């Protein structure tokens, strides 16, 4: 026996009912004592924190200081004071506020969604074509506060996926809008394939700030009609539902930050190398200038030493006449018996030269030339 359409629809509702629905409560300066920290996530958003706290069965969750998530079961409105300091954006979704440095953004999870209480029962309804007769089922399931009964089989739900225009197309809302669409399933094979497609996309596209979806369906005359109401405050992506909560929905911004970090690192390395080269050149020029200055001083000192005049004290160079108080006989014994004294050859008051210019004269006599200092008397 082929699967019953109503059973497949109820299975679809049980899957979609696990999607996360939540409402913003308020901004508070503190939390009740039963709130505990769930995680601290680098790409934090309300959708991610909602998923964490839904898995723990909590009734409320709170976002704090960009990236921290807290879960609890007590409504802070009854015991905690409100605050206006929820002004820090979420790291995972910059258009959304994740509390503040001393404030908490508190959200309430949908209680029916959290309990996952969807009753399902087998139905004997089976339709093979639009013209065939249908035995209605009396099964009724309600999973949200907004529900309506339009036929014998009715279900209302809150989730994060939307079926619009036709069973073959699904898309996520991207602006503040309210949309309503309907679709008709006329064959069992079409219902099965569309249910699987919807189930595969129902767990995606959870990046909205505040999203409420209400989907109802009913069977009439062998046909199944879907009616979807969507109320969206804001959303990140439009088109087909391809984004997922957490790191996948923010992969673009993560890549951009990585590129920015690489550029900053490269710029820092280049700047450091240029600065090091400039400092090395300055040190080299300073050392060269000091060496040139020292060389100039050394050469100047050597030059001054070279041109410095030699001084001879007068007492060391007295003339032979003054020291002997008379003319010297010029004997060898007299010169050596009186001792050796330093004599300045250019400071002698008397010069005597004995000798001849011509050893032999015409007459055969040697003439003696005697030169006497005329300033001294004999």
Swiss-Prot record:
Positions of modified residues (Phosphoserine): 331, 353
Keywords: Cell cycle, Cell membrane, Cell wall biogenesis/degradation, Glycoprotein, Membrane, Phosphoprotein, Signal, Stress response, Transmembrane, Transmembrane helix
Signal peptide (residue range): 1-21
CC annotations in GO: cellular bud; cellular bud neck; endoplasmic reticulum; fungal-type vacuole; mating projection tip; plasma membrane
Topology with respect to the bilayer: Single-pass type I membrane protein
Spans within the Cytoplasmic topological domain: 286-378
Superkingdom per UniProt: Eukaryota
InterPro entries: Kremen_rcpt, WSC_carb-bd
Biased composition annotated in UniProt, kind: Low complexity: 236-253, 319-331
Disruption phenotype: Lack of SLG1 leads to a significant defect of 1,3-beta-glucan synthesis and confers sensitivity to caffeine, SDS, Calcofluor and alkaline pH stress. Deletion of residues 21-256 results in non-functional protein, removal of residues 21-110 yields a protein still able to confer some tolerance to alkaline stress, and deletion of residues 116-256 has no effect on the function.
GO terms for biological process, alphabetical: actin cytoskeleton organization; endocytosis; establishment of cell polarity; fungal-type cell wall organization; pexophagy; positive regulation of endocytosis; response to heat; response to osmotic stress
Note: Present with 664 molecules/cell in log phase SD medium.
Name this protein carries in UniProt: Protein SLG1
């Amino acid at each position: 026996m082929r699967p019953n359409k109503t059973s497949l629809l109820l299975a679809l509702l049980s899957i979609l009912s696990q999607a996360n629905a939540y409402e913003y409560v308020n901004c508070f300066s503190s939390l009740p004592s039963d709130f505990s920290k769930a995680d601290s996530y680098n790409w934090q958003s309300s959708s991610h924190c909602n998923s964490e706290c839904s898995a723990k069965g909590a009734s409320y969750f709170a976002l704090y200081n960009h990236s921290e998530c807290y879960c609890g079961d007590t409504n802070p409105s009854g015991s905690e004071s409100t605050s206006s300091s929820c002004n820090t954006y979420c790291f995972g979704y910059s258009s959304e506020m994740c509390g503040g440095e001393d404030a908490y953004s508190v959200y309430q999870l949908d209680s029916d969604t959290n309990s996952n209480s969807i009753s399902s029962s087998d139905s004997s309804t089976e339709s093979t074509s639009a013209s065939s007769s249908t035995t209605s089922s009396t099964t009724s399931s309600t999973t949200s506060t907004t529900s309506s009964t339009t036929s014998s089989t009715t279900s209302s739900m809150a989730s994060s996926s939307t079926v619009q225009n036709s069973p073959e197309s699904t898309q996520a809302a991207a602006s503040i809008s309210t949309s309503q669409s309907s679709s008709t399933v006329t064959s069992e094979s079409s219902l099965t394939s569309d249910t699987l497609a919807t189930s595969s996309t129902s767990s995606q596209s959870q990046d909205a700030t505040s999203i409420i979806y209400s989907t109802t369906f009913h069977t009439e005359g062998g046909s199944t009609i879907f009616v979807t109401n969507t109320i969206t405050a804001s959303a990140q992506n439009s088109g087909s539902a391809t984004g997922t909560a957490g790191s996948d929905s923010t992969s673009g911004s993560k890549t951009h930050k990585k590129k920015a970090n690489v550029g900053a690192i490269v710029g820092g390395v280049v700047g450091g190398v240029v600065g090091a080269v400039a400092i090395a050149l300055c040190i080299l020029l300073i050392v060269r200038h000091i060496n040139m200055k020292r060389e100039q001083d050394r050469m100047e000192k050597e030059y001054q030493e070279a041109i410095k005049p030699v001084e001879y004290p007068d007492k060391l160079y007295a003339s032979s006449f003054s020291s002997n108080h008379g003319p010297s006989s010029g004997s060898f014994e007299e010169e050596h018996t009186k001792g050796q004294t330093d004599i300045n050859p250019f400071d002698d008051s008397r010069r005597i030269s004995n000798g001849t210019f011509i050893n032999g004269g015409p007459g055969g006599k040697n003439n003696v030339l005697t030169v006497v200092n005329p300033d001294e008397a004999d």
